[in-house]
Amino acid sequence: MSDVLVVADHRRGELRPVSYELLTAGRELADALGGDVHATVVGGDVDRFAEQLDCEGVDAVHTVAEGEEFNHDVTTAAVTALFEALDPAAVVMPNSVNGLDYAPAVATRLSLPLVTDAVGLDGDDGLTVTREMYG
């Protein structure tokens, strides 16, 4: 349970740049925890996205081909099933419209905490997530 699962984000046939930011954060966290980085992409054209995600620092890429555009139910089920199969220490999801749609559902199904708007991850002494607060 030291691996990190990163969920890639795409829109209109393009992998979004935030996906690479998430992979970098996931790699740093996995290194601190002594684990691997698993990337996943759900939706259309997943083979092309998988090639783009299969870069240095990514140990495995998992795909779920389903439609062309985002589907809440499919993404929620896919990420939940992958979490149950891999049992990672953390799941890193995009803070995008789609990510904020399915992330709470995944957390609820798995009975796990969810931190949105995270600005930092640290695995040196357990798992610490930093989130800015305003007020």
Question: Locations of the language-model features?
Answer:
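N-terminal glycine-rich FAD/FM-binding segment characteristic of electron-transfer flavoproteins
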Residues: M1-G135
